[in-house]
Swiss-Prot record:
This is Flavin-containing monooxygenase 3. It catalyses: trimethylamine + NADPH + O2 = trimethylamine N-oxide + NADP(+) + H2O; N,N-dimethylaniline + NADPH + O2 + H(+) = N,N-dimethylaniline N-oxide + NADP(+) + H2O; hypotaurine + NADPH + O2 + H(+) = taurine + NADP(+) + H2O; (S)-nicotine + NADPH + O2 = trans-(S)-nicotine N(1')-oxide + NADP(+) + H2O. InterPro entries: FAD/NAD-bd_sf, Flavin_mOase, Flavin_mOase-like, Flavin_mOase_3, FMO-like. It comes from Canis lupus familiaris (Dog). Its cofactor is FAD. FAD binds at residues 9-13, 32, 40-41, 61-62. The chain crosses the membrane at residues 512-532. It comes from the Eukaryota. GO terms for molecular function: albendazole monooxygenase activity; flavin adenine dinucleotide binding; hypotaurine monooxygenase activity; N,N-dimethylaniline monooxygenase activity; NADP binding; trimethylamine monooxygenase activity. GO terms for biological process: taurine biosynthetic process. Keywords: Endoplasmic reticulum, FAD, Flavoprotein, Membrane, Microsome, Monooxygenase, NADP, Oxidoreductase, Phosphoprotein, Transmembrane, Transmembrane helix.
Length: 532
């Protein structure tokens, strides 16, 4: 084996990192503080300190063809959007098939990660771990941090005057597990993210009244998109990205808002974002609009102040006799085992080159995997991040100078503020980011060449969903089954829905979809030109 690599965390990022190390002949050792793999997706009856926590009813927001490991498709009969237990089943099968479990030390807490005295020459790290009360130290050639960012809850109590006076229950959404104990209660959920909306709509079936308080609003998308197909297989395409980047900003913004409002007018539901043209990550919830229509969930602005039993909103209205306040206010980014001078985290801004590498290390032997967020699935993103990180650790790929990396970070930060706003500085565009990472290791598909040599595949790659298999067509880790997986991805999408024979399942009409995408912006341009 080659260099020794420490991997912190055995969620999907950690598993991708173990596999990438093995593919490139490195020696991985993964430290996992719990007794099982899965990280965020491993449900527990109680929230555990230092570990991500989910509620019992969590389903994926990405469909199975878009969120698999790129050389390991889900079984045909798996549903397109999975319950957390189903995804955990897939993760377990993957880890066993790839023989990853033997590289994981369970129930092991990483206490500290420090540079060795000769780090500027060796690039090595001293890592102290603890298991069953016993501490041990070991030296590693590199470290991959895969501990996630849904661990340390953000509870902005100072932003809500009077909260300490409130006599009802008050807790972060990570503590929420199931709705039974809220029967007949009056509940205020603060935050309009995925967790806040999921919890609110679930509670609406048992609670007396549920209100969501939102500071800035949000786009709300459905998992069910055009003609009933999974949203991401229709929305996340290279062609759509090409249009977005090619059209004038005014046209691109208009088209984006039209897509977001296709299901319902957000203004009518009190959900409209303050700046609707920002590409902030939308909320995925199939129930919320219906709950608002039925009156079981109401949307209110930010809370101005609390009293002993009530919440006063910024519009002057009051929600009285509150039994419980649930803060779905996200998480803070922290690495308690690491000197903060290596990875700085302040005001949601972190200093990482491409969201992965600390730029000022003398040796590029540390990487953060799975930190970046995008309107795309986590698993393929972490897989590609890990593949590049391992190539850098091996020395096969090199990083730019510190100056160039810092300039890139500053440039990307400006772009992110423009597209996503101040609260989403870890967010990025999915396809652009994936292509950038893939180009570093020679895994980016050559679209023009594909049109010349394999037009059938090229059409699916460019106009169809940008599925993970595309990034295993070429380069290190190339998968011989990638081409067939791309050409059969719609078959696997339709298979679990074929539970009653009513004719042949229909794949999407790509031509009709493309016409819809292309013609409307053209018509808008024509009308715009006619009016000036």
């Amino acid at each position: 084996m080659g260099k020794r690599v420490a991997i912190i965390g055995a969620g999907v990022s950690g598993l991708a990192s173990i596999r990438s190390c093995l593919e490139e002949g490195l020696e991985p050792t993964c430290f996992e503080r719990s007794e099982d793999i899965g990280g965020l997706w491993k449900f527990s009856e109680h929230a555990e300190e230092g570990r991500a926590s989910i509620y019992q009813s969590v389903f994926t927001n990405s469909s199975k063809e878009m969120m698999c490991f790129p050389d390991f498709p889900y079984p045909d009969d798996f549903p397109n959007f999975m319950h957390n237990s189903k995804l955990q089943e897939y993760i377990t099968v993957f880890s066993k098939e790839k023989n990853l479990l033997k590289y994981i030390q369970f129930k092991t807490l990483v206490c500290s990660v420090n540079k060795r005295p000769d780090f500027s020459v060796s690039g090595q790290w001293d890592i102290t771990t603890e298991r069953d009360g016993k501490r041990e130290s070991a030296t590693f050639d590199a470290v991959l941090i895969c501990s996630g960012h849904h661990v340390y809850p953000n509870l902005p109590e100072e932003s809500f005057p009077g909260l300490k006076l409130f006599k009802g229950k008050c807790f972060h959404s990570r503590e929420y597990k199931e709705p039974g104990i809220f029967k007949g209660k009056r509940v205020l959920v603060i935050g309009l993210g995925n967790s806040g909306c999921d919890i609110a709509t679930e509670l609406s079936h048992t609670a007396e009244q549920v209100i969501i308080s939102s500071r800035s609003g949000s786009w709300v998308m459905s998992r069910v998109w055009d003609d009933g197909y999974p949203w991401d297989m229709m929305f996340i395409t290279r062609f759509e990205t090409f249009l977005k980047n090619s059209l004038p900003t005014i046209i691109s913004d208009w088209w984006y808002m039209k897509q977001m409002n296709a299901r319902f007018k957000h203004e009518n539901y009190g959900l409209m974002p303050l700046n609707g043209t920002l590409r902030k990550e939308p909320v995925f919830n199939d129930e919320l609009p219906a709950c608002i229509l039925c009156g079981t969930v109401s949307i209110k602005p930010n809370v101005k102040a609390f009293t002993e039993t009530s919440a006063i909103f910024e519009d002057g209205t009051v929600f009285e006799a509150i039994d419980c306040v649930i803060f779905a206010t996200g998480y803070n980014y922290a690495y308690p085992f690491l000197d903060e001078s290596i990875i700085k985290s302040k005001n949601n801004e972190i200093t990482l080159f491409k969201g992965i590498f600390p730029p000022k290390l003398e040796k590029p032997t540390m990487a953060v995997i799975g930190f970046v967020q995008s309107l795309g699935a986590t698993i393929p993103t972490t897989d590609l991040q890990a593949r590049w990180a391992v190539q850098v650790i091996k020395g096969t790929c090199t990083l730019p100078s510190v100056t160039d990396m810092m300039n890139d970070i500053d440039k990307k930060r400006e772009g992110k503020l423009k597209w996503f706003g101040t609260s989403e500085t870890v967010q990025t565009d999915y396809i652009s980011y994936m292509d950038e990472l893939a180009s570093f290791i020679g895994a980016k598909p050559n679209i023009p060449w594909l049109f010349l040599t394999d037009p059938k595949l090229a059409v699916e790659v460019f106009f169809g969903p940008c599925s993970p298999y595309q990034f295993r067509l070429v380069g290190p880790g190339k998968w011989p089954g990638a081409r067939n997986a791309i050409l059969t991805q719609w078959d696997r999408t339709l298979k679990p829905m074929k539970t009653r024979a009513v004719g042949n399942p229909q794949k999407p009409c790509m031509l009709c979809h493309l016409v819809k995408l292309f013609v409307l912006p053209v018509l808008f341009i024509a009308v715009f030109l006619a009016l000036i």
